[in-house]
Amino acid sequence: MGPVSERSPAFTRRGVVEGFFGPPWSMAARRRLFAFGAARGMNTYLYAPKDDPYHRARWTEPYPRAAWRALAGLIADARRHRIDFVYGFHPGAGLRFADAAPVQTLLAKAARFHDAGVRTFAVLFDDIPSRLEHPADRRRFGNSLARAQGAWLAAIHARQPSAWRDVEWWLCPSYYSPDPRLARAFGAFEPEFLETLAAALPQEVACLWTGPAIVPERITLGHVRAVAARLRHRLILWDNYPVNDLAMRDELHIGPLAGRDPRLPRAVHGYLNNPLLQPELGLLPLATCFDYAAAAAAYRPEASWAAAVTARFGARALPHWRAIRAFDEARRRAQKAQRPVRLSAQARARIRAAGRYLARHRDERWAREIAPWRAAMRAA
């Protein structure tokens, strides 16, 4: 398969990538996501929580019995909701690309997921050093990380069981955005990374990409067309909204998705959102992401958000959620400017009313998740 046709009317893949750093969501929270998302057009879930050791740090090891039973149950629940469960492997740290053994290890682990019904797998090389670590890899791949990653996927593709005709593979390359923060964190990337990767990667493999930045304010059709022209493979956007991990953990991204070109489905195969660490609160911004993914041309951020709040909490709660959202946005602006939060008397009154609303619902799951921000509101 080649790149998605620019005449495509909608994203083929729509859903969530649980790909953040921090405590993974519970199985119960994931099931609630499936029910919530399936009703809003979600059809894909990529399992890739950075802090699941068997996904990343200990990826070569099988899941222990209890953990596997829970995962198998989750896979079955996804299938009941007609959601494609995508299992992500993160083998990047210390991987010896020139060795055959890691490919066989990955395929052996994938076979268990295949037996449970998984038909899409992702290999994730995000957030690892930008240069090959081992001399044998540097000799074999000409010191090119891009060539090594493409060749590794080609080896997986070639060695998978012949019966896996319905299996799809995705790749998240180490260079997943032109954001300069990537090079500062992991080292400068080789020139022509995407072109080199494209030449080595099987055409059937789709590629994940976050956009012009790791956490982009805007993603335009022009940007994704330019990336697609270099990569020449189907693109799946890994959109880091509304995620709030790492340096963003004090932020509460509950507003609507914004700044996404309504024409992106013309050039993008899939669109996945990385969610909040707080799963119950996270359903609010995700509702707007699902609205965009299902009908990008008709999407109106504020109308979608108001409808999501009303559906979840009732129309009378809308002013309180507007106040909570406004407070968090004001707090972020103040932190960025390194100054105290500045609020008008009217804004303080609205925040106090919102605080009383939160107090009335303090025993609900979402209210427990918002407790740190409620404390900040009281102190404002």
Language model: regions and residue ranges:
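Active-site-proximal loop/turn and secondary-structure-junction residues that shape catalytic pockets
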Residues: 22, 33, 51-53, 89-93, ...
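Catalytic-core regions of glycoside hydrolase
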Residues: 19, 119, 135-295
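A generic structural motif
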Residues: 47-50, 238-241, 299-309
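Residue-level preference for long, well-ordered alpha-helices that form the structural scaffold
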Residues: 26, 63, 67, 98-102, ...
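C-terminal functional modules
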Residues: 294-380
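A generic secondary-structure signal
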Residues: 36, 77, 108-112, 155-159, ...
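Short acidic, glycine/proline-rich loop/turn micro-motifs
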Residues: 56-59, 133-137
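Feature activates predominantly on carbohydrate-active enzymes
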Residues: 1-111, 115-119, 126
